[in-house]
Design a protein with these regions (language model features):
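Catalytic Tyr-X3-Lys loop
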Residues: 94, 101-120, 139, 157, ...
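Active-site loop-to-helix junction immediately N-terminal to the catalytic Tyr of the SDR YXXXK motif
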Residues: 103, 149-158, 170, 198
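Residue(s) in the substrate-gating loop at a strand-loop-helix junction
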Residues: 143
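Conserved glycine-rich cofactor-binding loop
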Residues: 19-21
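Short, small/polar-rich loop/turn modules that mediate ligand/substrate recognition or access, typified
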Residues: 176, 181, 236-238
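Short C-terminal tail/terminal secondary-structure segment
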Residues: 2-4, 148, 226, 237-250
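Active-site helix of classical SDR
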Residues: 123, 160, 168
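Alpha-helical segment proximal to the catalytic Tyr-Lys
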Residues: 128, 173-174, 234
Length: 250
């Protein structure tokens, strides 16, 4: 173990949704903290760009594997490709604002598959194949939405993020005896493509809810993820870590 408890030196970490946003920032931070990373995302070219942008440390060469985690065959192929890991970051997610009366079943199913089913099934498959080392750490990107705050039209997204937090707490109980910790980060609004559909007026109105006067940068969330992956969080499990700039205070 490093004398710096926040170091990730010697750890191998699988990061889903790593082609952009929070996943990209997490990949860069983990490498800079000494980890070897395995990147996965459905967007092959963007994933390759992330891979190529990482620092070149030959002794801990990163790996990448493009996969649609809602496809059982591709998920299985990723798990087979993956070496033994010390950390898992489930970060892939999508969002669509829709009033309840206008929800389309196909959209409901699509968002549930990506935000809820995929991280659960990836976790299950890695555990079944005994790919997560004792003393490992699992971190899910959940949300303040639904868990700590609700908003009109956000029922589908919020319900999936509530679901992933409930799953996180359940497996924290299940895996504690194996020394595997399970936590989540719960951001508010983050400056990523996920909020690209918001108008400037909508963003200006929303930012009034943030005491710190801005939305999060992807790096702000990555810092929390890296903490939960590190030995500094060795006694932290079953925790939903709010990183929301004080948004849920109001």
């Amino acid at each position: 173990m490093s004398s710096n408890l926040f170091s990730l030196k010697g750890k191998t970490i699988l990061i889903s949704g790593s082609a952009g946003g929070i996943g990209n920032a997490t990949a860069h931070l983990c490498v800079n903290l000494g980890a070897r990373v395995i990147l996965t995302d459905i967007r092959q070219e963007a994933l390759k760009d992330t891979f190529n942008s990482l620092p070149d440390f030959q002794e801990r060469e990163p790996l990448y594997f493009a996969a649609d985690l809602t496809n059982s065959d591709e998920l299985a192929a990723l798990v087979d490709f993956c070496p033994q890991i010390d950390g898992l970051v489930c970060n892939a997610g999508v969002m669509k604002l829709t009033l309840t009366q206008f929800i389309k079943e196909e959209e409901l199913i699509r968002i549930q598959k990506i935000n809820l089913n995929a991280p659960i099934l990836l976790t299950k498959s890695l555990l079944k194949k005994k790919k997560i080392n004792k003393g490992g750490s699992i971190v899910y990107t959940a949300s303040a939405a639904g868990v700590f705050r609700v908003s009109i039209g956000n029922g589908i997204y919020a319900s999936t993020k509530c679901g992933i937090d409930a799953f996180m707490r359940t497996i924290a109980l299940e895996l504690g005896s194996k020394g595997i910790r399970c936590n989540s980060v719960n951001p508010g609004m983050v400056e990523t493509a996920l909020i690209g559909s918001f108008t400037e007026e909508e963003k200006a109105n929303e930012i009034k809810n943030y005491p710190l006067g801005r939305f999060a940068k992807p790096e702000d969330i990555a810092y929390g993820i890296a903490y939960l992956l590190s030995e500094a969080a060795a006694f932290v499990t079953g925790t939903a870590l709010k990183i929301d700039g004080g948004m849920t205070l109001s």
